[in-house]
């Protein structure tokens, strides 16, 4: 409340006034003292009078002339000052007259004289005056002490303020540093954000660039693919054109041969009832037609399929023409023979007429297969040039055997040892051929090549060379070729993939040593006549076992091997042959042609299709040959090869099926499914086990 606040202010003001600072003794009544005792007693000097006289009065006398106030006023003013009487005995003793205030007796004498001259005042006034002086001194000392304490307090406050200011300055510096750090962080974040945005923009530009580059590469790739496709189409068109052109030349060659046969029929002109000139005129027209087609095709670039078809129709017409002429000649000859017989019947006697049918009766020519059944339809005549080639190879093989006959029949132990070492050196490396690594295959090839080149090789821990015997090279070549074929008969028959490493080594040796290749063919044709292709005929007087051996069957103790084993061996040798004609040694001279290339595979396939099929055998061999060599023939002959496959499907399959029994349909079904799958996908897969470029790096 306001009144209470004013009361407290009043009390505080009274306490701060001079009277409020007076000291009052409240326990005087308890001590039994009389209030008026001191007033009623006689005046007496205070115990402080000596000190006052000594210290205070001299100063008062000196300052009295200068003072403008009277003693009475001074006393009055002194009386008005608060009186403080210390109660401490120490203080009283300090101001007592007994304290040593007079150093000598002279001074004490002067003081006594001075004291005597002074007018004695009342004891209470002196006491009050002393108290006043004492109070002033105490007050002054207290003020000095308070000032000192105040100064110390102020210094303390100044130090505190200084420390506080220092702390505030530190806080300010910290705050400023924090602010700068925050600004730096903000600036750094802004810079990082800007950098990230720049990087993002850069990445975006890079992505756009990559996208555009990808699109451009795709376009370039598409353009390149289109160019390659067009180039491939152009190449195929040219190759097809060249094939058609070669076919046209072949047709013209055949046409000319037929024309020569037509001209050769002049000797029968007298027998014919028809006009031979009409046949010759039509033949000349057909020859001119084919020549005109070839001439027009040469001028326009390459012949078209229509031109080829027209030429084939002309050739077919020429064949029909020649066949009709042959029929006319045959008919005329029959008529002439009939006339001769009739004339002979008139001239000869009845006995001679009875003998004439026996003379004209043809002797039987039995043709029996391995089972003893007659198979006259299998006796298809092979082309003369093929039989000549077959016979030349067999003659060369026999001549080679005769050459080293002295070495094989020698009784000399040294010669026998040389023969055994040479045989091992020739056959063991062939047995070691495998698909383990290309480097291993190259070592085997180099060893065989060194042996055939007359260089010494290591075999069985000994050095062997064909120069150890004059007949050593012939012997090694024969045994090496025999071993290659035997590997096809045994190893390839069991593991079809083995055909390729064996074939590539055989092909490389064949290229460097052609005689070995001829001996390989001779051994192959002898063990597998279907690789010619050649179907041996059963001749009159021939033993059945000999005929079965000619067909390729193994006969031991008059027992013929099982059909499955026979087909397995034939399959292995055909697979080896199909691999040889398509493979070349990768380290050889690429500029030289293959010594026995794909053209022989085309020839084999064409000739096998021109012959009547054999039950179970033809289907098996065709499947093996096409599975191994079909991909290479497809790449080489392309359209013509596909035409041949269509021919097999449409014309040859019915012929095989017609002669195949229900128990032998497995091989035919396998061939049929393989061919239909190839025609459906328009591709022949790469055979399993084919040697790739990575194999030669292993």
UniProtKB/Swiss-Prot annotation:
MF terms (GO), sorted A to Z: inositol hexakisphosphate binding; phospholipid binding; translation initiation factor binding
Cellular compartment(s): Nucleus; Cytoplasm; Nucleus, Nuclear pore complex
Domain of life: Eukaryota
Coiled coil: 152-270, 304-356
Gene Ontology cellular-component terms listed: cytoplasm; nuclear pore cytoplasmic filaments
Alphabetized Gene3D superfamilies for the sequence: GLE1-like
One Pfam family of this chain: GLE1
InterPro entries, alphabetized: GLE1, GLE1-like_sf
Location of the region described as Interaction with NUP155 in the Swiss-Prot/TrEMBL record: 1-29
Amino acid composition bias (Low complexity), ranges on this chain: 65-79, 88-103
Positions bearing Phosphoserine: 88, 99
Subunit structure: Associated with the NPC, however it may not be a stable component of the NPC complex since it shuttles between the nucleus and the cytoplasm. Interacts with nuclear pore complex proteins NUP155 and NUPL2.
Protein name: mRNA export factor GLE1
Lineage start: Eukaryota, Metazoa, Chordata, Craniata, Vertebrata
């Amino acid at each position: 409340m306001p009144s209470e606040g004013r009361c407290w202010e009043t009390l505080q003001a009274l306490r701060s006034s001079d009277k409020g600072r007076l000291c009052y003794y409240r326990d005087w009544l308890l001590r039994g003292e009389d209030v008026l005792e001191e007033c009623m007693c006689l005046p007496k000097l205070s115990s402080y009078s000596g000190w006052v006289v000594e210290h205070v009065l001299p100063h008062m006398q000196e300052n009295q002339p200068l003072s403008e106030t009277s003693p009475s006023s001074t006393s009055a003013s002194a009386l008005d000052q608060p009186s403080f009487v210390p109660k401490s005995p120490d203080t009283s003793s300090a101001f007592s007259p007994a304290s040593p205030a007079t150093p000598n007796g002279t001074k004490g004498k002067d003081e006594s004289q001075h004291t005597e001259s002074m007018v004695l005042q009342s004891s209470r006034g002196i006491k009050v005056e002393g108290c006043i002086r004492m109070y002033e001194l105490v007050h002054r000392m207290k003020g000095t002490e308070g000032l000192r304490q105040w100064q110390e307090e102020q210094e303390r406050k100044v130090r505190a303020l200084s420390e506080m200011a220092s702390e505030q300055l530190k806080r300010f510096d910290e705050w400023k540093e924090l602010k700068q750090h925050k600004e730096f962080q903000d600036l750094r974040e802004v810079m990082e954000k800007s950098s990230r945005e720049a990087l993002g923009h850069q990445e975006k530009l890079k992505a756009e660039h990559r996208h555009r580059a990808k699109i451009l590469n795709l376009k370039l790739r598409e353009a390149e693919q289109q160019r390659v496709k067009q180039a491939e189409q152009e190449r195929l068109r040219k190759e097809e054109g060249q094939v058609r052109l070669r076919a046209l030349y072949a047709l013209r060659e055949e046409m000319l041969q037929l024309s020569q046969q037509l001209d050769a029929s002049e000797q029968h002109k007298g027998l014919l009832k028809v006009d031979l000139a009409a046949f010759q005129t039509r033949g000349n027209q057909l020859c001119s037609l084919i020549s005109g087609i070839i001439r027009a095709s040469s001028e326009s670039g390459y012949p078209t399929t229509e031109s080829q078809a027209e030429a084939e129709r002309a050739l077919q017409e020429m064949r029909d023409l020649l066949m009709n002429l042959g029929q006319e000649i045959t008919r005329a000859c029959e008529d002439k023979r009939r006339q001769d017989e009739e004339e002979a019947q008139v001239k000869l006697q009845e006995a001679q007429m009875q003998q004439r049918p026996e003379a004209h009766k043809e002797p039987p020519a039995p043709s029996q297969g391995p089972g003893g059944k007659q198979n006259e339809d299998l006796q298809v005549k092979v082309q003369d040039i093929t039989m000549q080639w077959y016979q030349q190879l067999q003659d060369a093989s026999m001549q080679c055997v005769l050459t080293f006959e002295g070495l094989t029949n020698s009784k000399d132990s040294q010669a026998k040892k040389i023969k055994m070492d040479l045989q091992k050196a020739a056959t063991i490396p062939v047995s070691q051929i495998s698909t383990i690594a290309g480097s291993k295959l190259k070592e085997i090839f180099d060893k065989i090549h060194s042996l055939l080149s007359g260089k010494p090789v290591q075999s069985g821990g000994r050095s062997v060379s064909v120069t150890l015997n004059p007949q050593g090279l012939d012997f090694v070549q024969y045994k090496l070729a025999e071993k290659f074929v035997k590997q096809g008969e045994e190893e390839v028959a069991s593991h079809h993939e083995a055909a390729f490493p064996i074939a590539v080594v055989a092909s490389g040796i064949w290229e460097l040593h052609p005689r070995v290749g001829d001996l390989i063919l001779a051994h192959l044709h002898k063990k597998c006549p279907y690789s010619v292709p050649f179907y041996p005929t059963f001749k009159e007087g021939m033993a059945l076992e000999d005929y079965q051996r000619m067909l390729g069957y193994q006969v031991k103790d008059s027992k013929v091997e099982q059909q499955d084993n026979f087909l397995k061996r034939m399959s292995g040798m055909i697979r080896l042959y199909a691999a040889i004609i398509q493979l070349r040694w990768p380290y050889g001279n690429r500029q030289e042609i293959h010594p026995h290339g794909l053209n022989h595979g085309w020839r084999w396939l064409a000739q096998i299709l021109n012959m009547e099929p054999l039950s179970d055998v033809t289907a098996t061999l065709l499947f093996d040959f096409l599975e191994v060599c079909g991909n290479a023939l497809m790449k080489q002959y392309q359209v013509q090869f596909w035409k041949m496959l269509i021919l097999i499907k449409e014309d040859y399959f019915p012929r095989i099926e017609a002669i195949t029994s229900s128990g032998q349909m497995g091989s035919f079904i396998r061939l049929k499914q393989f061919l239909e799958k190839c025609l459906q996908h328009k591709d022949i897969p790469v055979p399993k086990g084919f040697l790739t470029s990575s194999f030669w790096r292993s």
